[in-house]
Swiss-Prot record:
It comes from Schizosaccharomyces pombe (strain 972 / ATCC 24843). It comes from the Eukaryota. InterPro entries: Vps71/ZNHIT1, Znf_HIT. Component of the SWR1 chromatin-remodeling complex. Component of the SWR1 complex which mediates the ATP-dependent exchange of histone H2A for the H2A variant H2A.Z leading to transcriptional regulation of selected genes by chromatin remodeling. One of its GO terms (biological process) is chromatin remodeling. The gene is vps71. PANTHER family: ZINC FINGER HIT DOMAIN CONTAINING PROTEIN 1 (PTHR13093). Keywords: Chromatin regulator, Cytoplasm, Metal-binding, Nucleus, Zinc, Zinc-finger. A zinc finger (HIT-type) spans 102-134. This is SWR1 complex subunit vps71. Its main location: nucleus.
């Protein structure tokens, strides 16, 4: 079958307009997966060495000095405390809708990507998002 250049252009345009729109459940699952990856990244706390002269200038109680010089992390302290309420505390849901920020620059995200639903603010940020940050494959 012979295809004219006009028909070829129409077919090409139709293919470009077809986008894979992802349902909210898949978006939520991808968001949770990204948050879990961020939790795993840089899991160890940064250790700051306190100079001896700073500790000797001020009169600090022994308990404070012990905490400052300890190698324990915040997670270790949470594990030690019995009946820790840090992980169980919950705030009531907000009555306001969640604010949307641009995924690229952090400004107000007034537009949303049709593929993944991520917010962006301008055409330039949309181009950057579609080239580098858009999750095109959902599994």
């Amino acid at each position: 079958m012979f295809v004219t250049p006009i028909e070829h252009a129409v077919q090409k345009r139709k293919k470009q307009k077809q986008r894979s729109v992802v349902d909210p459940v898949t978006r939520e699952r991808q968001l949770k997966r990204n948050l879990a990856d961020l939790e795993k990244d840089n899991f160890s706390d940064i250790r700051f060495e306190i100079p001896k002269d700073l500790l000797q200038r001020r009169v600090l109680p022994i308990s404070v000095r012990r905490i400052l010089s300890s190698r324990k992390t915040f997670v270790n302290y949470l594990d030690e405390t019995p009946n820790s309420r840090y992980n169980t505390c919950v705030a009531k849901p907000s009555y306001k809708p969640p604010r949307k920020f641009c995924n690229v620059c952090g400004y107000w995200g007034k537009y949303a990507c049709q593929n993944c639903g991520t917010s962006y603010c301008s055409k330039g940020c949309e181009v950057i998002h579609s080239e580098t940050r858009c999750m095109k494959v959902y599994a």
